[in-house]
Amino acid sequence: MSSRAETPRVPFLDLKAAYEELRAETDAAIARVLDSGRYLLGPELEGFEAEFAAYCETDHAVGVNSGMDALQLALRGLGIGPGDEVIVPSHTYIASWLAVSATGATPVPVEPHEDHPTLDPLLVEKAITPRTRALLPVHLYGHPADMDALRELADRHGLHIVEDAAQAHGARYRGRRIGAGSSVAAFSFYPGKNLGCFGDGGAVVTGDPELAERLRMLRNYGSRQKYSHETKGTNSRLDEMQAAVLRIRLAHLDSWNGRRSALAAEYLSGLAGLPGIGLPVTAPDTDPVWHLFTVRTERRDELRSHLDARGIDTLTHYPVPVHLSPAYAGEAPPEGSLPRAESFARQVLSLPIGPHLERPQALRVIDAVREWAERVDQA
Protein backbone atom coordinates (compact mmCIF):
# COMPACT_ATOMS: atom_id res chain seq x y z
CA MET A 1 0.00 0.00 0.00
CA SER A 2 1.40 3.39 -1.01
CA SER A 3 2.33 5.75 1.81
CA ARG A 4 1.83 8.79 -0.39
CA ALA A 5 -1.24 10.76 0.63
CA GLU A 6 -3.86 11.01 -2.07
CA THR A 7 -4.20 14.52 -3.51
CA PRO A 8 -7.45 16.04 -2.23
CA ARG A 9 -10.09 16.88 -4.81
CA VAL A 10 -10.70 20.50 -5.71
CA PRO A 11 -14.25 21.12 -4.45
CA PHE A 12 -16.67 23.18 -6.48
CA LEU A 13 -17.53 25.23 -3.39
CA ASP A 14 -16.40 24.70 0.19
CA LEU A 15 -19.30 25.60 2.48
CA LYS A 16 -17.65 24.07 5.53
CA ALA A 17 -14.64 26.37 5.14
CA ALA A 18 -16.99 29.36 5.02
CA TYR A 19 -18.45 28.30 8.36
CA GLU A 20 -15.03 27.64 9.89
CA GLU A 21 -13.79 31.14 9.01
CA LEU A 22 -16.64 32.74 10.95
CA ARG A 23 -17.33 29.94 13.44
CA ALA A 24 -16.99 31.97 16.65
CA GLU A 25 -19.17 34.86 15.44
CA THR A 26 -21.73 32.50 13.93
CA ASP A 27 -22.01 30.27 16.98
CA ALA A 28 -22.46 33.33 19.19
CA ALA A 29 -25.21 34.69 16.93
CA ILE A 30 -27.06 31.37 16.92
CA ALA A 31 -26.77 31.10 20.69
CA ARG A 32 -28.13 34.64 21.01
CA VAL A 33 -31.24 33.66 19.05
CA LEU A 34 -31.75 30.45 21.00
CA ASP A 35 -31.40 32.28 24.29
CA SER A 36 -33.87 34.96 23.20
CA GLY A 37 -36.77 32.57 22.68
CA ARG A 38 -37.79 34.71 19.68
CA TYR A 39 -37.57 32.77 16.42
CA LEU A 40 -39.77 34.61 13.90
CA LEU A 41 -40.26 38.26 12.94
CA GLY A 42 -37.95 39.50 15.66
CA PRO A 43 -34.98 41.83 16.12
CA GLU A 44 -32.53 39.77 14.05
CA LEU A 45 -34.78 40.01 11.01
CA GLU A 46 -35.37 43.72 11.56
CA GLY A 47 -31.65 44.29 11.90
CA PHE A 48 -30.79 42.27 8.83
CA GLU A 49 -33.47 43.95 6.71
CA ALA A 50 -32.13 47.40 7.61
CA GLU A 51 -28.51 46.38 7.00
CA PHE A 52 -29.22 44.61 3.71
CA ALA A 53 -31.30 47.52 2.39
CA ALA A 54 -28.44 49.89 3.22
CA TYR A 55 -25.96 47.54 1.56
CA CYS A 56 -28.10 47.48 -1.59
CA GLU A 57 -28.31 51.30 -1.50
CA THR A 58 -32.08 51.27 -1.23
CA ASP A 59 -34.71 51.92 1.44
CA HIS A 60 -36.46 48.64 2.19
CA ALA A 61 -35.66 44.94 2.41
CA VAL A 62 -38.25 42.29 3.19
CA GLY A 63 -36.93 38.90 4.30
CA VAL A 64 -38.75 35.85 2.94
CA ASN A 65 -38.35 32.08 2.84
CA SER A 66 -36.45 31.66 -0.45
CA GLY A 67 -35.30 33.34 -3.63
CA MET A 68 -38.23 31.93 -5.57
CA ASP A 69 -40.65 33.26 -2.97
CA ALA A 70 -38.92 36.63 -3.27
CA LEU A 71 -39.65 36.67 -7.00
CA GLN A 72 -43.19 35.39 -6.66
CA LEU A 73 -44.13 37.83 -3.90
CA ALA A 74 -42.54 40.73 -5.77
CA LEU A 75 -44.70 39.92 -8.79
CA ARG A 76 -47.80 39.53 -6.64
CA GLY A 77 -47.03 42.77 -4.85
CA LEU A 78 -47.08 44.53 -8.21
CA GLY A 79 -50.50 43.04 -8.99
CA ILE A 80 -49.30 40.61 -11.64
CA GLY A 81 -51.47 37.52 -12.09
CA PRO A 82 -53.66 35.49 -14.46
CA GLY A 83 -53.89 36.89 -17.98
CA ASP A 84 -50.60 38.77 -17.69
CA GLU A 85 -47.31 38.03 -19.43
CA VAL A 86 -43.85 38.46 -17.96
CA ILE A 87 -40.74 38.40 -20.14
CA VAL A 88 -38.11 36.03 -18.74
CA PRO A 89 -34.71 34.86 -19.99
CA SER A 90 -34.67 31.66 -22.01
CA HIS A 91 -31.36 30.81 -20.32
CA THR A 92 -31.78 30.82 -16.55
CA TYR A 93 -32.58 28.59 -13.59
CA ILE A 94 -36.17 27.35 -13.70
CA ALA A 95 -37.14 29.31 -10.57
CA SER A 96 -37.29 32.49 -12.67
CA TRP A 97 -40.08 30.94 -14.74
CA LEU A 98 -41.77 29.08 -11.88
CA ALA A 99 -42.23 32.28 -9.90
CA VAL A 100 -44.16 33.78 -12.81
CA SER A 101 -46.23 30.64 -13.28
CA ALA A 102 -47.06 30.57 -9.56
CA THR A 103 -48.85 33.92 -9.89
CA GLY A 104 -50.98 32.60 -12.75
CA ALA A 105 -49.16 34.79 -15.27
CA THR A 106 -47.38 33.43 -18.36
CA PRO A 107 -43.57 33.44 -18.68
CA VAL A 108 -42.52 34.58 -22.16
CA PRO A 109 -38.92 33.52 -22.90
CA VAL A 110 -36.47 35.82 -24.66
CA GLU A 111 -32.93 34.90 -25.67
CA PRO A 112 -29.70 36.15 -24.06
CA HIS A 113 -26.89 37.89 -25.88
CA GLU A 114 -24.88 35.43 -27.96
CA ASP A 115 -21.74 35.97 -25.84
CA HIS A 116 -23.25 37.07 -22.50
CA PRO A 117 -25.74 35.16 -20.34
CA THR A 118 -28.19 38.03 -19.76
CA LEU A 119 -31.27 39.24 -21.65
CA ASP A 120 -30.70 40.79 -25.07
CA PRO A 121 -32.75 44.05 -25.01
CA LEU A 122 -33.02 44.08 -28.81
CA LEU A 123 -34.97 40.83 -28.64
CA VAL A 124 -37.00 41.87 -25.59
CA GLU A 125 -38.82 44.63 -27.45
CA LYS A 126 -39.99 42.19 -30.13
CA ALA A 127 -41.62 40.03 -27.45
CA ILE A 128 -43.68 42.80 -25.82
CA THR A 129 -47.44 42.44 -26.36
CA PRO A 130 -50.51 44.21 -24.94
CA ARG A 131 -50.56 41.55 -22.19
CA THR A 132 -46.97 42.17 -21.08
CA ARG A 133 -46.85 43.56 -17.54
CA ALA A 134 -43.22 43.14 -16.51
CA LEU A 135 -39.66 42.31 -17.51
CA LEU A 136 -37.75 39.86 -15.33
CA PRO A 137 -34.03 40.18 -16.10
CA VAL A 138 -31.68 37.75 -14.35
CA HIS A 139 -28.18 38.86 -13.36
CA LEU A 140 -26.95 35.40 -14.24
CA TYR A 141 -23.69 34.01 -12.86
CA GLY A 142 -23.22 37.33 -11.02
CA HIS A 143 -23.11 39.42 -14.24
CA PRO A 144 -25.47 42.43 -14.33
CA ALA A 145 -27.92 42.65 -17.20
CA ASP A 146 -28.10 45.71 -19.48
CA MET A 147 -30.39 47.65 -17.16
CA ASP A 148 -30.30 51.01 -18.95
CA ALA A 149 -31.67 49.49 -22.14
CA LEU A 150 -34.23 47.43 -20.26
CA ARG A 151 -35.40 50.41 -18.19
CA GLU A 152 -35.82 52.47 -21.34
CA LEU A 153 -38.01 49.72 -22.81
CA ALA A 154 -39.99 49.38 -19.59
CA ASP A 155 -40.57 53.12 -19.32
CA ARG A 156 -41.63 53.39 -22.95
CA HIS A 157 -44.11 50.52 -22.68
CA GLY A 158 -45.31 51.16 -19.12
CA LEU A 159 -43.88 47.93 -17.69
CA HIS A 160 -42.57 46.90 -14.29
CA ILE A 161 -39.07 45.47 -13.87
CA VAL A 162 -38.49 42.72 -11.33
CA GLU A 163 -34.78 41.93 -11.11
CA ASP A 164 -33.73 38.38 -10.30
CA ALA A 165 -30.57 39.08 -8.31
CA ALA A 166 -30.27 35.60 -6.77
CA GLN A 167 -26.69 35.32 -8.05
CA ALA A 168 -25.63 38.96 -7.86
CA HIS A 169 -25.25 40.09 -4.23
CA GLY A 170 -22.97 43.12 -4.37
CA ALA A 171 -22.64 43.34 -8.15
CA ARG A 172 -22.62 46.83 -9.62
CA TYR A 173 -24.10 48.37 -12.76
CA ARG A 174 -22.75 51.80 -13.68
CA GLY A 175 -21.26 52.09 -10.20
CA ARG A 176 -24.45 51.33 -8.29
CA ARG A 177 -25.23 48.08 -6.55
CA ILE A 178 -27.84 45.77 -8.01
CA GLY A 179 -31.05 46.72 -6.24
CA ALA A 180 -30.21 50.42 -6.04
CA GLY A 181 -32.56 52.47 -8.15
CA SER A 182 -34.65 49.46 -9.17
CA SER A 183 -38.36 49.28 -8.49
CA VAL A 184 -37.86 45.82 -7.01
CA ALA A 185 -35.14 43.16 -6.90
CA ALA A 186 -35.27 39.63 -5.51
CA PHE A 187 -32.36 37.85 -3.79
CA SER A 188 -31.76 34.27 -2.70
CA PHE A 189 -29.73 33.24 0.34
CA TYR A 190 -29.44 29.58 -0.62
CA PRO A 191 -26.25 28.24 1.02
CA GLY A 192 -24.21 28.30 -2.19
CA LYS A 193 -24.93 31.95 -3.03
CA ASN A 194 -22.40 34.75 -2.55
CA LEU A 195 -24.42 35.64 0.55
CA GLY A 196 -25.85 32.37 1.83
CA CYS A 197 -27.46 31.16 5.03
CA PHE A 198 -27.74 27.69 6.59
CA GLY A 199 -30.85 26.68 4.66
CA ASP A 200 -33.29 28.49 2.41
CA GLY A 201 -33.83 32.23 2.59
CA GLY A 202 -34.49 35.23 0.41
CA ALA A 203 -35.30 38.93 0.37
CA VAL A 204 -36.97 41.56 -1.77
CA VAL A 205 -35.47 45.05 -1.89
CA THR A 206 -37.32 48.13 -3.07
CA GLY A 207 -37.39 51.88 -2.76
CA ASP A 208 -41.20 51.89 -2.70
CA PRO A 209 -42.58 51.99 0.88
CA GLU A 210 -46.08 50.94 -0.18
CA LEU A 211 -44.76 47.91 -2.04
CA ALA A 212 -42.60 46.99 0.95
CA GLU A 213 -45.65 47.10 3.21
CA ARG A 214 -47.64 44.89 0.81
CA LEU A 215 -44.77 42.41 0.74
CA ARG A 216 -44.66 42.27 4.53
CA MET A 217 -48.34 41.41 4.53
CA LEU A 218 -48.05 38.84 1.76
CA ARG A 219 -45.23 36.97 3.50
CA ASN A 220 -47.24 36.73 6.73
CA TYR A 221 -50.62 35.27 5.73
CA GLY A 222 -51.77 38.62 4.34
CA SER A 223 -51.68 40.12 7.81
CA ARG A 224 -50.27 43.26 9.42
CA GLN A 225 -51.84 42.39 12.75
CA LYS A 226 -52.31 38.88 14.10
CA TYR A 227 -55.63 37.29 13.07
CA SER A 228 -56.50 40.25 10.84
CA HIS A 229 -55.99 39.13 7.23
CA GLU A 230 -56.32 41.85 4.59
CA THR A 231 -55.35 39.75 1.57
CA LYS A 232 -54.65 36.13 0.63
CA GLY A 233 -51.04 35.88 1.67
CA THR A 234 -48.70 33.00 2.33
CA ASN A 235 -46.22 31.80 4.94
CA SER A 236 -42.81 32.99 3.75
CA ARG A 237 -40.79 34.47 6.58
CA LEU A 238 -37.02 34.59 6.91
CA ASP A 239 -36.51 33.17 10.40
CA GLU A 240 -34.44 34.73 13.17
CA MET A 241 -31.70 32.09 13.02
CA GLN A 242 -31.03 32.63 9.33
CA ALA A 243 -31.25 36.41 9.72
CA ALA A 244 -28.64 36.31 12.49
CA VAL A 245 -26.28 34.23 10.32
CA LEU A 246 -26.81 36.56 7.36
CA ARG A 247 -25.96 39.61 9.47
CA ILE A 248 -22.58 38.05 10.26
CA ARG A 249 -21.91 37.12 6.65
CA LEU A 250 -23.10 40.41 5.17
CA ALA A 251 -20.21 42.16 6.92
CA HIS A 252 -17.80 39.89 5.02
CA LEU A 253 -19.58 39.89 1.65
CA ASP A 254 -17.40 42.48 -0.09
CA SER A 255 -14.24 40.72 1.07
CA TRP A 256 -15.52 37.36 -0.10
CA ASN A 257 -16.61 38.83 -3.44
CA GLY A 258 -13.12 40.29 -3.78
CA ARG A 259 -11.64 36.82 -3.41
CA ARG A 260 -13.97 35.55 -6.12
CA SER A 261 -12.89 38.38 -8.43
CA ALA A 262 -9.21 37.59 -7.85
CA LEU A 263 -9.80 33.95 -8.77
CA ALA A 264 -11.77 34.97 -11.85
CA ALA A 265 -8.86 37.17 -12.95
CA GLU A 266 -6.53 34.19 -12.46
CA TYR A 267 -8.76 32.02 -14.63
CA LEU A 268 -9.17 34.67 -17.34
CA SER A 269 -5.41 35.10 -17.56
CA GLY A 270 -4.49 31.43 -17.33
CA LEU A 271 -7.11 30.20 -19.81
CA ALA A 272 -6.82 33.01 -22.37
CA GLY A 273 -6.38 31.95 -25.97
CA LEU A 274 -7.09 28.26 -25.52
CA PRO A 275 -8.59 26.67 -28.64
CA GLY A 276 -12.20 25.63 -28.30
CA ILE A 277 -12.73 27.30 -24.90
CA GLY A 278 -14.98 30.36 -24.64
CA LEU A 279 -14.38 32.50 -21.57
CA PRO A 280 -16.94 34.69 -19.78
CA VAL A 281 -17.28 38.25 -21.04
CA THR A 282 -17.72 41.21 -18.70
CA ALA A 283 -20.09 43.78 -20.19
CA PRO A 284 -19.15 47.48 -20.15
CA ASP A 285 -20.04 49.46 -17.01
CA THR A 286 -20.53 46.32 -14.92
CA ASP A 287 -18.72 44.89 -11.91
CA PRO A 288 -19.71 41.22 -11.67
CA VAL A 289 -19.34 39.25 -8.46
CA TRP A 290 -18.47 35.93 -10.10
CA HIS A 291 -21.07 33.75 -8.46
CA LEU A 292 -20.03 31.28 -11.14
CA PHE A 293 -17.11 31.09 -13.55
CA THR A 294 -18.64 29.39 -16.56
CA VAL A 295 -16.73 28.49 -19.71
CA ARG A 296 -18.20 27.26 -22.99
CA THR A 297 -17.05 24.44 -25.24
CA GLU A 298 -18.74 22.17 -27.75
CA ARG A 299 -16.92 19.27 -26.07
CA ARG A 300 -18.22 20.10 -22.62
CA ASP A 301 -18.82 16.54 -21.46
CA GLU A 302 -15.31 15.50 -22.50
CA LEU A 303 -13.79 18.40 -20.57
CA ARG A 304 -15.91 17.63 -17.53
CA SER A 305 -14.81 13.98 -17.56
CA HIS A 306 -11.17 15.03 -17.91
CA LEU A 307 -11.41 17.40 -14.94
CA ASP A 308 -13.19 14.77 -12.86
CA ALA A 309 -10.36 12.33 -13.57
CA ARG A 310 -7.92 15.01 -12.39
CA GLY A 311 -9.81 15.38 -9.11
CA ILE A 312 -11.64 18.60 -9.95
CA ASP A 313 -15.35 19.09 -9.30
CA THR A 314 -17.47 21.00 -11.81
CA LEU A 315 -21.16 21.73 -12.35
CA THR A 316 -23.37 22.58 -15.33
CA HIS A 317 -25.51 25.73 -15.15
CA TYR A 318 -27.84 24.63 -16.72
CA PRO A 319 -27.96 21.35 -18.66
CA VAL A 320 -31.62 21.50 -19.75
CA PRO A 321 -33.12 24.72 -21.15
CA VAL A 322 -36.27 25.61 -19.25
CA HIS A 323 -38.41 25.51 -22.40
CA LEU A 324 -37.40 21.86 -22.90
CA SER A 325 -38.09 20.86 -19.29
CA PRO A 326 -41.02 18.45 -18.85
CA ALA A 327 -42.49 20.98 -16.42
CA TYR A 328 -43.25 23.27 -19.37
CA ALA A 329 -44.18 20.63 -21.95
CA GLY A 330 -46.98 21.96 -24.12
CA GLU A 331 -46.60 25.50 -22.77
CA ALA A 332 -43.15 26.65 -23.88
CA PRO A 333 -41.75 27.00 -27.40
CA PRO A 334 -40.55 23.76 -29.04
CA GLU A 335 -36.99 22.51 -29.42
CA GLY A 336 -34.98 24.59 -31.88
CA SER A 337 -36.98 27.77 -31.28
CA LEU A 338 -34.56 29.23 -28.73
CA PRO A 339 -31.14 28.33 -30.18
CA ARG A 340 -29.06 30.57 -27.91
CA ALA A 341 -30.47 28.98 -24.76
CA GLU A 342 -29.96 25.54 -26.26
CA SER A 343 -26.37 26.45 -27.16
CA PHE A 344 -25.62 27.60 -23.61
CA ALA A 345 -27.14 24.41 -22.20
CA ARG A 346 -25.03 22.27 -24.52
CA GLN A 347 -21.76 24.12 -23.96
CA VAL A 348 -21.54 25.57 -20.43
CA LEU A 349 -19.32 24.22 -17.67
CA SER A 350 -18.78 25.96 -14.34
CA LEU A 351 -15.31 25.70 -12.82
CA PRO A 352 -14.67 25.78 -9.06
CA ILE A 353 -14.86 29.28 -7.59
CA GLY A 354 -15.62 30.71 -4.18
CA PRO A 355 -14.07 32.74 -1.39
CA HIS A 356 -12.37 29.68 0.09
CA LEU A 357 -10.83 28.27 -3.07
CA GLU A 358 -7.07 28.64 -2.65
CA ARG A 359 -4.90 30.01 -5.45
CA PRO A 360 -2.94 26.72 -5.79
CA GLN A 361 -6.26 24.95 -6.35
CA ALA A 362 -7.22 27.46 -9.05
CA LEU A 363 -3.83 26.96 -10.72
CA ARG A 364 -4.44 23.22 -10.66
CA VAL A 365 -7.75 23.79 -12.46
CA ILE A 366 -6.03 25.99 -15.04
CA ASP A 367 -3.32 23.40 -15.68
CA ALA A 368 -5.91 20.66 -16.14
CA VAL A 369 -8.03 22.70 -18.56
CA ARG A 370 -4.94 23.72 -20.53
CA GLU A 371 -3.79 20.10 -20.69
CA TRP A 372 -7.13 19.04 -22.15
CA ALA A 373 -7.43 21.93 -24.61
CA GLU A 374 -3.92 21.47 -25.96
CA ARG A 375 -4.39 17.72 -26.32
CA VAL A 376 -7.69 18.19 -28.17
CA ASP A 377 -6.11 20.81 -30.43
CA GLN A 378 -3.36 18.40 -31.45
CA ALA A 379 -5.71 15.48 -32.09
Curated annotation (Swiss-Prot):
The keyword Iron does not apply. Belongs to the degT/dnrJ/eryC1 family. Its EC number is 2.6.1.106. Pyridoxal 5'-phosphate binds at residues 67, 167, 188-193, 221, 227, 235-237, 318. It holds the Pfam family DegT_DnrJ_EryC1. One of its GO terms (biological process) is macrolide biosynthetic process. This is dTDP-3-amino-3,4,6-trideoxy-alpha-D-glucose transaminase. It comes from Streptomyces venezuelae. PANTHER family: 3-OXO-GLUCOSE-6-PHOSPHATE:GLUTAMATE AMINOTRANSFERASE (PTHR30244:SF36), TRANSAMINASE (PTHR30244). InterPro entries: DegT/StrS_aminotransferase (IPR000653), PyrdxlP-dep_Trfase (IPR015424), PyrdxlP-dep_Trfase_major (IPR015421), PyrdxlP-dep_Trfase_small (IPR015422). The keyword Transmembrane does not apply. Its cofactor is pyridoxal 5'-phosphate. GO terms for molecular function: pyridoxal phosphate binding; transaminase activity. The modification N6-(pyridoxal phosphate)lysine is found at residue 193.
